[in-house]
């Protein structure tokens, strides 16, 4: 069975069915912020360290697979579907997933409504941008209820998945207009928080998983999506989430976009609060302003494309064999850069919780990307050397955030 094909012109792998043998994932990010996204919009996000700065939860051994992720729901008169098929699993009239260089685009269509979900991590910012574009392809107006959904991790992914007696009482959020701030432990233990925002005024929102999904519900059919609205819940403890709801009407042939962002904000200790007990949102507000319009998002995508074009231009093969040229000139180099960023420390099989960066593996990985980005190779060599002891021994593996072994 054929599941997709290479689009050499656009430098993409195009997946033509959501039901691949296993989730097929792309790695977004090239600096400090990373997201894993599958061909059905599953995955998770983290800042630098998949254990110690995890923004969103992921259940690796869940059944069914790949239910956690970067979710968009569309309720069209009671028909609930996702642009990437999961988790609702409503049969789509058409589906494609385009895994590109640092971005993924999911395109789904159902009953004359087309939805494109475009995800990427921009250069120079610690955030993921998730742009949804809706189009009414029919000759009649269509009214839709559109929802976003992410489930926040309480930062330390190891503790988050084990210390439940404590974690069920620590979750804390704040909502300002269309921005949902996840600020668990910010007051006393941390100087960083996450923000999940939209550039469009919300109709309603939720921050409680129980309110959005239902105590006995789940991401396949959340109670809020079935009801057509959220309940404006403010969670205290339990499971904090971010969910936006928009009630939209599209005229025949009309297109509308909503820009979502998931960002990581770290404040200097002296600048943690803008007033007693009020988190300093200045950096978050500046980040949101940088991606408030389609023109700004388009510019960020072009900058990302230019970055990859420059990286790949130094080594190109013309052998007369199309498949060999494609592997050497594009996908092998892309994979080497992903390996440089991750060092196998985070995937759908390596949870990022226990392994960290391998000393030997990271040394070997240098051979694959040093020609593309020698300055970053030098940084990696110094990082690896910094974990060695005076007698020449070293940690077998270490956490990328702290450089401490585990």
Residues of each region from the PLM?
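Anionic coordination/interaction segments
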Residues: 1-360, 374-383, 387
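Short alpha-helix boundary/capping motifs
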Residues: 160, 174, 393-395, 405
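Carbohydrate-binding/catalytic loop surfaces
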Residues: 347-356, 395-406
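Well-ordered alpha-helical scaffold segments within catalytic/enzyme domains
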Residues: 363-375
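Short, mixed-charge aromatic SLiMs
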Residues: 386-396
């Amino acid at each position: 069975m054929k599941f997709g094909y290479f689009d050499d012109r656009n430098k993409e792998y195009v997946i033509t069915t959501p039901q691949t043998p296993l989730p097929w994932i792309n790695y977004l990010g090239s600096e400090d912020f990373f997201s894993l996204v599958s061909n059905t919009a599953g995955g998770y996000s983290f800042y630098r360290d998949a254990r110690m700065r995890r923004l969103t939860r992921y259940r690796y051994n869940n059944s069914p697979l790949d239910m956690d992720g970067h979710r968009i729901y569309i309720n069209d008169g009671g028909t609930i579907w996702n642009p990437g098929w999961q988790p609702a699993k409503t049969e789509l009239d058409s589906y494609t997933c385009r895994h590109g260089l640092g971005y993924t685009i999911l395109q789904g269509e159902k009953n004359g409504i087309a939805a494109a979900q475009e995800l990427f991590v921009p250069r120079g910012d610690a955030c993921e941008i998730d742009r949804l574009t809706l189009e009414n392809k029919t000759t009649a107006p269509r009214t839709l209820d559109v929802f976003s959904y992410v489930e926040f991790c309480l930062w330390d992914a190891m503790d988050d998945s084990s210390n439940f007696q404590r974690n069920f009482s620590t979750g804390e959020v704040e909502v300002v207009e269309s921005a949902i701030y996840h600020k668990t432990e910010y007051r006393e233990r941390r100087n960083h928080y996450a923000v999940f925002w939209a550039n469009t005024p919300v109709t309603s929102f939720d921050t409680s998983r129980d309110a959005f999904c239902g105590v006995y519900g789940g991401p396949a059919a959340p109670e809020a999506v079935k009801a057509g609205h959220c309940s404006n819940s403010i969670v205290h403890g339990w499971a904090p989430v971010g969910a936006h709801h928009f009630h939209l009407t599209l005229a025949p042939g009309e297109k509308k976009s909503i820009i979502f962002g998931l960002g990581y904000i770290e404040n200097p200790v002296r600048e943690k609060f803008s007033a007693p007990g009020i988190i300093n949102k200045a950096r978050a507000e500046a980040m949101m302003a940088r991606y408030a319009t389609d023109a700004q998002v388009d510019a960020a995508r072009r900058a990302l494309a230019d970055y990859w074009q420059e990286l790949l231009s130094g080594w190109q093969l013309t052998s007369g064999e199309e498949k060999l040229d494609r592997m050497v000139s594009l996908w092998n180099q892309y994979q080497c850069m992903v390996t440089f960023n991750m060092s196998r420390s985070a995937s759908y099989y390596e949870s990022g919780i226990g392994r960290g960066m391998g000393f030997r593996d990271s040394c070997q990985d240098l051979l694959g990307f040093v020609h593309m980005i020698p300055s970053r190779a030098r940084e990696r060599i110094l990082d690896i050397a910094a974990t060695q002891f005076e007698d020449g021994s070293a940690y077998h593996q270490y956490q990328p955030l702290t450089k401490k072994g585990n």
